[in-house]
A protein has these predicted regions:
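Membrane-embedded helical hairpins/re-entrant loop segments and their flanking transmembrane helices
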Residues: 21, 47-66, 70-85, 260-333
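Juxtamembrane interface elements at the cytosolic ends of transmembrane helices
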Residues: 2-7, 39-43, 47, 189-200, ...
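Membrane-embedded alpha-helical modules
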Residues: 105-228, 338-452
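Short, non-helical or kinked segments that cap or interrupt transmembrane helices
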Residues: 59-60, 81-96, 144-151, 205-212, ...
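N-terminal signal-anchor module of multipass membrane proteins
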Residues: 2-88, 95-108, 137
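Intrinsically disordered, low-complexity non-transmembrane regions of multi-pass membrane transporters
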Residues: 1-26, 231-242, 278-288, 292-295, ...
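Hydrophobic, membrane-embedded alpha-helices of multi-pass small-molecule transporters
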Residues: 22-34, 179-191, 208-209, 223-224, ...
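Hydrophobic transmembrane alpha-helices of multi-pass solute/ion transporters
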Residues: 9-10, 14-18, 193-196, 210-261, ...
Length: 462
């Protein structure tokens, strides 16, 4: 097998290339447009579900951006053993949203006030992050269960998110406007523009395809009256990080639940970093790959420690950006530095970041549907790289069946205890846990003929 597995896309700027400032800026803005709303959404969802004050919710949003900027800087620059050295963007981990809501709602029903709820949720998040730090040092020993089979599930589970946004998002479902002509029309317009610009021969136009598509969709949304500016009217002018703003408290019961999600997030990080390495034309096996995995997971843990301390939900590497890399052809980690600085600035000045939250879901969905599909393709490539023997076929089929099945109807396991249900309702967790268990249970000697031969050259993957 070749040392480096190509992603099947033409890179304009490879990992160590230094793009001119204007091209780096376009690339950074493209990545920001892909992640900004998903980055701030978890804080908004948790704030609304727990009925937190507007001030607290705004602070959570700002700290999510600042922590993401710090984490991205660590990942792309790779200080010593910390960081993947890839264009790995950090953002809030959606896996924690339902857990935080469940734990916070339980405390709220018991009469705890907002400050104590936040101190407890952030406290267990702070301690739990050290589990990820520890896991980074034993990744080689977890190789039997954390495999490319597990990694490939990540991208495949994201397509539903893009489609829902394409139709207007969850808010549109609640209001009864989901899938109306306005949402579908705007989403389709963005999709067509992004595809069109990605077919251009001009590298600059190709790099800016997603950003241009979103701008065109935003203008169309303004004309249709779909843009709501109410969320930016009462935001403060500037926000400064305040470590342990709500104090620090700890619950061992909550730690067990949050700690489990943290350990499962290692699966997600391994998959995201593997996909990033692949689309960046770096090895997905061997010493360099293992070093990047260790550094990336270690950075995930350390950044979540920082995030929890300043008041953000836990962070992880973001899979969405792998689709941006593949579509734009920009894998330079130096673009990541620009992204990191911009995220910190957006966090310090929430009025600037608030503007991006006004982008309608349908506009984002038009671009994300294509990006998530590209991520799914990268995941499939990861799965088939080493070939699928009969044992691996059973593992892939079962884990994908349960993982994707849960994404279609998360309530299928609702009869289970709440502490278990919050794990298996997540497609990545459900599919990942299934793959892990089958990797442990199925005998290693059960390896018959290849059902799908492995890819051994870049040409075969194109």
């Amino acid at each position: 097998m070749s040392d480096i597995n190509h992603a099947g896309s033409d890179l304009i700027f490879e990992l160590e290339d230094r793009p001119p400032f204007h091209q780096a800026l376009v690339g950074a803005i493209t990545h920001l447009l892909a992640i900004f709303v998903p980055m701030v959404t978890p804080a908004l969802i948790v704030g609304a579900a727990l009925q937190l004050s507007a001030e607290t919710t705004a602070y959570l949003v700002s700290m999510a951006m600042i922590a993401s900027g710090i984490g991205t800087w660590l990942q792309v620059n790779r200080y010593g053993i910390v960081g993947s050295g890839l264009l790995s963007i950090q953002s809030v981990n959606f896996s924690f949203v339902t857990v935080m809501i469940a734990l916070g709602s339980s405390m709220k029903s018991d009469g705890f006030h907002e400050e104590l709820i936040m101190s407890s949720l952030l406290g267990v998040s702070f301690v739990g992050a050290f589990l990820v730090v520890g896991s980074s040092f034993i990744l080689p020993y977890l190789r039997r269960v954390i495999t490319p089979t597990v990694s490939g599930i990540v991208g495949l589970s994201l397509i539903k998110v893009g489609i829902i946004d394409f139709g207007g998002g969850f808010a549109a479902k609640s209001s009864g406007t989901f899938g109306n002509y306005e949402h579908l029309g705007v989403g389709l317009l963005v999709l067509i523009v992004v595809i069109g610009f990605n077919c251009c021969s001009s590298p600059l136009l190709r790099m800016g395809g997603i950003a241009i598509g979103l701008c065109v969709g935003y203008i169309a949304s303004l004309c249709l009256g779909m843009v709501d500016f109410s969320s930016v009217r009462n935001l403060p002018l500037i926000t400064i990080p305040h470590p342990f703003k709500y104090g620090f408290s700890f619950s061992f019961h909550q730690f067990l639940v949050v700690g489990t999600i943290y350990l499962l997030s290692v699966l997600e990080a391994v998959g995201d970093i593997t996909a990033t390495a692949m689309v960046s034309r770096r090895p997905i096996q061997g010493e360099e790959y293992q070093s990047r995995l260790k550094g990336g997971v270690l950075a995930d843990g350390l950044v979540s420690v920082i995030a929890s301390a300043v008041g953000s939900l836990p962070l992880t590497t973001f899979a969405q950006n792998n689709g941006v890399i593949q579509m734009t052809g920009v894998a330079s980690r130096y673009v990541g530095r620009t992204i990191a600085v911009m995220l910190v600035i957006l966090g310090l000045f929430p009025m600037i970041g608030g503007f991006f939250t006004t982008i309608p879901s349908a506009v984002l969905g038009g671009a994300m549907t294509l990006m998530f599909s590209m991520i799914a393709i990268a995941g499939i490539r990861i799965i088939i790289t080493n070939g699928l023997k009969r044992r691996e076929t059973l593992i892939v089929a079962t884990s994908l069946g349960l993982g994707l099945g849960v994404s279609y109807d998360p309530e299928i396991f609702k009869i289970l205890p709440a502490s278990i249900y919050v794990l298996v309702e997540n497609p990545i967790c459900a599919g990942g846990l299934t793959a892990i268990l089958l990797n442990i249970i199925l005998p290693g000697g059960y390896r018959q003929e290849n059902v799908l031969p492995g890819i051994t050259s870049a040409e075969e993957m194109d």
